[in-house]
Amino acid sequence: MKKISLILLMMAMMVAFIGCNRTPVETPVPPVQTENPQPLEGTDTVVDPAPDGEITRVTLYFANNEYIVTGDARAEKVLPLERDITVGEKSVEEMILLELQNSPQDDDLSTNLENIKVLSVDTAEGVAYVNVAGERLSGGSLEETLVIYQIVYSLTELDDIEAVQFLVDGSKRETLMGHMSIEEPLKREDFSL
């Protein structure tokens, strides 16, 4: 009986962590301009059969659902997933952030960036400056931690990026969602998985 109560308590906590302060936001999908586009089977997504740009393999980091569900400090907060992206009009940094907003297509992983609006990404002297809109920034400490980890770990996989400086509406802030300091550029070494 105690095990069942513990499991129900953990599930309730998980729902509270994930569901608190989340407002569903519909994100408009830009039209894809191609000749004879074909939707992927089982989806509404249209894929350009001959994308412009160079295909690059990148390592993205997504939230570990085991960590979210159990809260076990021994579990890694984010896990790597390799993905091919097309770099053309947008930089590799911008494409990484766009990919982080998409579902990882893996039951063990999830993303916490689906509601975050990225305004710009610029890189200078080994620092990626990620500018996000303040209007969609809400969540508890777990959500904020996972958003920061996903972005910092994914961008610092690139050879020329050592740290990430977060900006909110173009300005430095103390925190992203009220819990973790983002006043200085964050390095991968600043965190422990």
Positions of predicted regions on the chain:
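Bimodal "functional hotspot" detector
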Residues: K2-L193
